[in-house]
Structures are given as C-alpha cells and as structure tokens.
Amino acid sequence: MTKREKIISCIQEGRGVLGIEFGSTRIKAVLIDENHNPIAAGDHEWENRLENGVWTYRLEEIWEGLQDSYAKLAEDVKNTYQIQLTRLGAIGFSGMMHGYMAFDREEKLLVPFRTWRNTMTEEAAAVLSECFAFNIPQRWSIAHLYQAILKGEEHVEKIDYLSTLAGYIHWKLTEQRVVGIGEASGMFPIDSAAGDYDAEMMQKFDALVADKGFPWKLREILPKVLRAGKMAGTLTKEGARLLDRSGCLQPGVPLCPPEGDAGTGMTATKSVEKRTGNVSAGTSVFAMIVLEKPLSAMHREIDMVTTPAGDPVAMVHCNNCTSDLNAWVGLFAEFAECFDIKADKNTLFSTLYQKAMEGDKDCGGMIACNYYSGEPVTGLEEGRPMFLRRPDSHLGLANFMRSHLYASLATLKIGLDILLKEEDVKIDSITGHGGLFKTKGVGQSILAAAMNAPISVMETAGEGGAWGMALLAAYMLSKKDGQSLGDYLDSRVFAERKSETMEPDLADVAGFETYTKQYQACLAAEKAAVQAF
C-alpha cells in the first residue's frame, strides 16, 4: 500500500484525528494520521476588536471562524485525496487561555467575551494574590470574576457557568462542562497532586464573597477538571452540525479535554517533562518551564500553571510580542506595492528577518517599545507602540528590524531572569515554536541570546498549537494503559522527528543584555506616552 493509499484508508475508516486551535489572529485546523503527521489543514484569520474599552470577539465570529477553518480542512481533504471527510477518530479543541465567558441558565452570554488581552482587573488580581498567597495574573478567569464583583456588575448573580473560549466550544459540541487541567490552571489555582482546583483557595474565595449572597458557590460554576488522556464526551448531532455546515460529519466522535494554548505548545514541543521548557512566540509570547520543585517565593511576574498532565509549570507571559513588528512589515509591504512590487507575506518576513542579522549586536542605539496593550510584567496598564533612537544612532534597516526582534522578546527576558537568576531554576532543553521561528535561524538565535541557553526548533515548529491539540486527542485515543503523556510523546511522536539546536553567540548575549537595560530605562518614556497620547 502506498503512503497516499494509507492516508486515504485512514480518513475513510475514521482513524484521522482533528485538532483545532483558536489563536488570537488565526484559527487553525489540522488533521493527523496514525503516525501523527499532518495530512490536511484549514485556517481562518480573525482579529479581536476593542469595544467599549474591552478586547473581545463576538460569538458569531467564533462560530464563523470554526466552521470556515473546518470547511477549508474538509476541502483540502477532498482536493488532495478526492474523498469526503465524514468520520473522525478523535477531536480536540484549544484556544487562547484565561479570559471570561459567563453564561446564565438559558446558556446566554451575560457580557461580551473578555479576552486574555484585557488588563482591567488590577484591583482584583492584587486582592486575590494576597488572599491566596499565590500569584493571580490579571488575565485569569477568577480575576475577571472578582473584578466584576468588586464593580458590582449586575450579571454576576445570574452566572450559571463560567468558561474559557476552548471550554465554551467543547461544551457546545458535547454538552460537557469540562476543561483540561492545563486550561483550568489559567482559570483558578490548581492542586497538582489532587488534579483539581485548589480546595483551600476555593474556600477562601467563597468566604471572601459570602456577604454578597450569590446563589452559587465557585465550584458549581467552574468546569470540571480533567487530566490529559481522559475522555471528555462525544460529538453530539447538534455539535456535528455546528462544526460542519455541510452536514457530512458523523456525530459520536470522542473528544479529549479542551486545552489552552500553553498546554498545546508544551505538547507540540515535547516539553512536558521536568527541566524542559518551551517558548511560544506570536502575537503574545510565553515561556513555560516544568519545575522540579516549587518556587521559593511568590513572584508577580511569574504565573504558576500546569502541563496537560497536571505537573507544575512556571510561566512568564507577555501580552506583547510581534504585533508591532508585524505592523511595520505591513508598512514595508505597502511601500513595495507603490512600486508595483508584489512580495508574498512569507518572503517579506524572511527577507526582513534575515536583514536583521546584519545589524549591530545591541541595535546601535535604537529601541522599539512594542506595547500594543498593557503589560503586567513591567507594570503597564495600556500600551503605545513607540520607536526611539538616539541622534547618533545608526538608522538602517538591519538595526531597525533587529531592534523590533529584540523588543519582541525583551519583556520575556525581564521575567525569565527572575527564574534563572533569582530562583536558580535548572533547564536542560528549551524549544521554540510559533510565528517568530518560521524564518530559519533568526528567531532561534535571538531567543538563544535572550536566555543565554541553547534553543531547539523542531521540523514541526510551524505546526504549532493545532497539531499539539491533535496529539493530545491522539494520546486519549491510542495510549497504552498507564502510559504517561511524556512517554507517549517520546516513543510514539518524536522518536523519528528532527530538531535543530543553536547555541547562544556570546556577542549576541552581551548585545541583548545592553539592549534590555536600555529597554527597561525607556519604559519611563512609554508610561509618559500612555499618559500624554
């Protein structure tokens, strides 16, 4: 049987596994075969909007995006293999973690979806962090809930279910109110040993709001927590229609627990074991390090989440990464079009990224402050993208692009230095993935300089979270009894896959250190810009 015939047989017999991830600018669907290789894909571009001071996506945009990405994947199957996609072996959904989707008993959304990007919960996050003696970031679901309580928002007493984006989609397609443990860890603190929400902190929260007289206790409105590998329901008839507008997809497909983009990133990079880590760099950027032991102190810059299997993870999350860089690349594309030069997006990015490597190691006196939105790691409530240079700086394209690439990781470096230098966390391997690493060697070398550590990029780096989600669904479907997620990934998924590792260049490391000090000094100007403009 040829490779193509095997794939056709896999699809026709319903052994293909589907992963769909809702990123902040793209919804991607990936179908994999029994060897965990992508065999079809579809995607849909979308953008959050700022409405009444809230970063949000509308419900109709969520469903339109889901249906379009699935339809494109089904079309890819039809065009490539000349068959109709009607059956699946398993499905998994993932999305941007955190945020706030509150529903009443009639399953109606009570307020517009508040995404992770909002930095409106400072008071709630501070009170809860002190109450729990545990860092509660502003974007966590519990911070959004408590902020709504502090503001006296009327909808709170009507809440019947509080979910995330991935949890919402899973619920609508299966009627199951569940999330994976990694996704849950971005809603409320987790007790890794119990594999559930931290019971003591939950009691503290209920006591904190007891005088409000709400008709619910916190556990009653949060989704049930499941570790990777558990079955989390099946696709209902209504769910199948919601996913596939053509009506071809058969219901009854098993679904794994929905996970967050952090968990799918760990899975896609084989970073679920202790002393491993990964950096996901796109619109936002985060680094996750699986810990050997708890941190010695609470750090407001460090979030504690878990792997999809429930092991503790230290996470540095920054709201801003490549948005400003992407905007400048868009400007250069527009400039090229004035001269009737049509460059495709990939060529444009790779050309400009490669150009950056010719720049001065410290960017020659240029600083890009890339804050589109607020940045809790550095204490900014709002952002104003800004480019600064000294009069004696060398203004050239290479330094300009290099400064924007450095900026995309500078805030991450500020947070990571706490883990590496203050907490003395040990890391054996770091894997990079996401859009920043698509151009060979560039994002990888910049991250190696930022962390002063070797960075690996896998041949699957461009697959990203949707592929990681498909792997989690495949793990549920195909694991042996008692087989851990780490062992499954090692033996079944990554044994044959290649990766390239790049050691840090010492001159780059020194240049990035200089740049980061200047970047931190320029945050005073950024704060002033927020006030003035």
Task: Kindly label every feature range from the protein language model.
Residues 1-111, 126-127, 158, 219, ...:
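N-terminal glycine/serine-rich phosphate-binding loop of ATP-dependent small-molecule kinases
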Residues 2-12, 18-19, 85, 123-139, ...:
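Active-site core segments that coordinate phosphate-bearing ligands/cofactors
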Residues 53, 113, 136-139:
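Short N-terminal micro-motifs specific to bacterial/archaeal maturation
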Residues 57, 61-65, 143, 442, ...:
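A general alpha-helical scaffold signature found inside nucleotide-binding enzyme cores
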Residues 118:
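Carbohydrate-associated surface elements
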